[in-house]
Amino acid sequence: MAPQKDKKPKKSTWRFHLDLTHPVEDGIFDSGNFEQFLREKVKVNGKTGNLGNVVHIERLKNKITVVSEKQFSKRYLKYLTKKYLKKNNLRDWLRVVASDKETYELRYFQISQDEDGSESED
C-alpha cells in the first residue's frame, strides 16, 4: 500500500468582472449604488450581508470586480445584476451578456427599425 500524502486544499479564488462602461457613461446607471446593492444582497453561507473576508467587491470606475475565496457562481452574479436592473426599471433597455469566461457586460438591446413593414397595410 502506498503511503498517504498530506493533502492540503488548494487556495483557489473565483474572480468575476462586470463591465458597466456604456450605461454609466450615458448616465442611466449608478455604479456606486449597484456596488452597495451587491454588498447587501450577496449570500454567503445562506445569509445576506455576511461577506466577511470571503467575498470582496471592488469598483474601479466603470468595472466591478467580485473576488471570492469560497465557491461563487457566475450565474448568481448575473441573477443579482438582473434583479438590480428590474428594481431600477432598466431591464427593458439593458441586458447582461457574457463577453468572456470571467466577464459580464451590460449592453443595450438592439432594436431594429423596420419602417417598410409597418402595420398600416390596407
From Swiss-Prot:
Residue ranges the record marks as coiled coil: none
Alphabetically ordered keywords of this record: Phosphoprotein, Ribonucleoprotein, Ribosomal protein
MF GO annotations: structural constituent of ribosome
Residues that bear Phosphoserine: 112, 118, 120
Keyword hit for Ubl conjugation: no
GO process annotations (BP): translation
One Gene Ontology cellular component: ribonucleoprotein complex
InterPro entries per record: Ribosomal_eL22, Ribosomal_eL22_sf
Any one Pfam family match given in the protein's UniProt record, by short name: Ribosomal_L22e
Domain of life assignment: Eukaryota
Residues spanning the membrane: none
Keyword field contains Ribosomal protein: yes
Family the entry assigns: Belongs to the eukaryotic ribosomal protein eL22 family.
Protein name: Ribosomal protein eL22-like 1
Organism: Mus musculus
Gene transcribed to yield this protein: Rpl22l1
